[in-house]
Amino acid sequence: MLTSLDYYRVFYYVAKHRSFTRAAEVLTTSQPTVTRTVKNLENDLGCRLFERDRRGVVLTAEGELLY
């Protein structure tokens, strides 16, 4: 599947703000949409881009390379 540039845009804002919620606010969309988009990108690339916890997100080694 060809990954949309919008996926990378969402990834960029999540990585920049270290938060799905803050990225959603900046992108004026919902947090579930941001989460789903990142999940789709991770599935397309075949790797995890973020480690998630209740305090936010941290880039994985693969995420660092993409960022």
Indicate residue ranges for each PLM-predicted region:
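C-terminal effector-binding regulatory domain of bacterial HTH transcription factors
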Residues: 1
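Core residues of bacterial helix-turn-helix
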Residues: 26-27, 38, 45, 66
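Short alpha-helical "packing" element that flanks the helix-turn-helix/winged-helix DNA-binding module
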Residues: 7-14, 66
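The N-cap/first-turn positions of alpha helices
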Residues: 4-7, 31, 63
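A short LG(V/I)-centered, amphipathic sequence patch enriched
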Residues: 20, 42-59, 64
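Short helix-boundary/capping micro-motifs
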Residues: 12-30
